Regions:
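Noncatalytic, helix-rich "gating/capping" subdomain that lines the substrate-entry/channel surface
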Residues: 1-172
Length: 172
């Protein structure tokens, strides 16, 4: 039910951005495929809390084999000025399946995820219709029946960058 709700609310939002039905279906399916891949390999909360079991040292040359498509030598040279001798891996299942994520085949899945992310980044700055559409899924999850009044939403948007300064001023 939640998945259908997410699809519906995201579809409605993308329609407001003039995406075609075909583009919307394609983006949603690619995003969900990436999510399925991630869910299959990422650690559960319980597994993540067992810190002693998260220590998996790999020789750097062995680690590079997990993701041959990544320019790891160039990355490490640029960031730390050398390549490491060892890499400590906590998400071992993820890295063992890294070719599912770091490959030409996986790029369309990432691209769809990036597009959806960019669409959602700007929603509060555009039209009120887009603001309301973008919050539909979150409201459904939290049980809020309707969107915040647009004047109140505008106030929260305007005061957002000054929230900490206003709080300090009020406290003194």
């Amino acid at each position: 039910e939640l998945l259908n709700l997410w699809k519906e609310s995201t579809s409605n939002l993308l329609k407001a951005y003039n995406f075609s039905d075909e583009e919307i279906e394609d983006l949603l399916e690619k995003r969900l495929e990436l999510d399925r891949r991630i869910a299959a390999v990422v650690l559960s909360n319980e597994e993540s809390s067992e810190y002693a079991k998260l220590y998996h040292p790999y020789a750097y040359e062995d680690f590079k084999k997990f993701a041959p498509a990544l320019p790891l030598d160039d990355f490490f040279q640029a960031v730390i000025g050398q390549t490491p001798d060892k890499v400590i891996v906590d998400e071992e299942r993820f890295w063992q399946a890294a070719d599912q994520f770091y490959s030409e085949e996986a790029w369309p899945l990432f691209k769809a995820t990036l597009i959806l992310g960019v669409v959602n980044l700007s929603t509060s700055y555009l039209t009120d219709e887009i603001r309301v559409l973008s919050g539909a899924y979150g409201r459904a999850l939290s049980g809020v029946p309707e969107a915040q009044d647009k004047v109140k939403a505008a106030y929260h948007l305007a005061q957002g960058p000054f929230k900490q300064a206003l709080g300090l001023w009020y406290a003194h």
